Design a protein with these regions (language model features):
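Conserved alpha-helix/loop element of class I SAM-dependent methyltransferases that forms part
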Residues: 1-7
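Conserved class I S-adenosyl-L-methionine
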Residues: 9-15
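Conserved SAM-binding loop of SAM-dependent methyltransferases across substrates and taxa
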Residues: 18-29
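Conserved SAM/SAH-binding beta-strand->alpha-helix loop
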Residues: 40
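Short alpha-helix immediately C-terminal to the canonical SAM-binding loop
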Residues: 44-45
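S-adenosyl-L-methionine
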Residues: 48-73
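C-terminal substrate-binding/active-site "lid" region of AdoMet-derived donor-dependent transferases
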Residues: 99-145
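Conserved small/polar residues in nucleotide/adenosyl-binding loops
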Residues: 175-181
Length: 185
């Protein structure tokens, strides 16, 4: 996930838990700073301890926040939402749309309902520019980097079945396939 974050910006980590990702990115000087946010005080306190231990209080702020509610528009270049179910990610994106849509990129790691997350991104004019999967302790976790774009005309050329397949299995490599278009159905 951390490798998907664009260099040089400010990261908002929604649901930060331990703040490991913001800490690692600041230490590597990949980002200027971060806003580590969590809905629960316990995880946020752990994040604050880790940030203090790394001596990065000057670079990483913490905020108690339900989703993106404590984030201002244009305050973050990258928004990371990871380690939670797809439905919760969709809730955060929907409730925080006025803020999330101002970020240059979304880095998402849904642990379920992946097809619904892809569908949301497509329907809200995001393009998935990078997608990968990691395996930790025998479990596979997809991750994706999406950027806001004008309407992607590629989707208009595909039939509904092909779009559904891309939502389930991922659209990043669909251009390498010979896919049926609306005219062929």
């Amino acid at each position: 996930m951390a490798s998907m974050v664009t260099t040089g910006g400010i990261l908002a980590d929604i649901g930060t838990d331990h703040a490991y990702v913001p800490i690692a990115l600041v230490q590597r000087q990949k980002i200027k700073g971060a806003i580590a946010m969590d809905i629960n005080e316990g995880p946020l306190a752990r994040a604050q301890e880790h940030i203090r231990a790394a001596r990065l209080e000057e670079y990483i702020q913490t905020r108690l926040s339900d989703g993106a509610e404590a984030l201002l528009p244009n305050e973050a270049d990258s928004i990371l939402i990871a380690g939670m179910g797809g439905e919760l990610i969709l809730h955060i994106l929907t409730e925080g749309e006025s803020v999330c849509s101002t970020a240059k990129e979304l880095i998402l790691q849904p642990q379920s309902e992946i097809h619904k997350v892809r569908e949301y991104l497509r329907q809200h004019q995001y393009k998935i520019e990078d997608e990968d999967m990691v395996c930790e302790e025998g479990k596979y976790y997809p991750m994706m980097r999406a950027v806001k774009t004008e309407q992607d005309e590629t989707w208009n050329r595909l039939n509904d079945q092909t779009i559904a397949v891309c939502d389930i299995y991922g659209p990043v490599s669909y251009t390498h396939l010979t896919l049926p278009t609306k005219l062929e159905v």
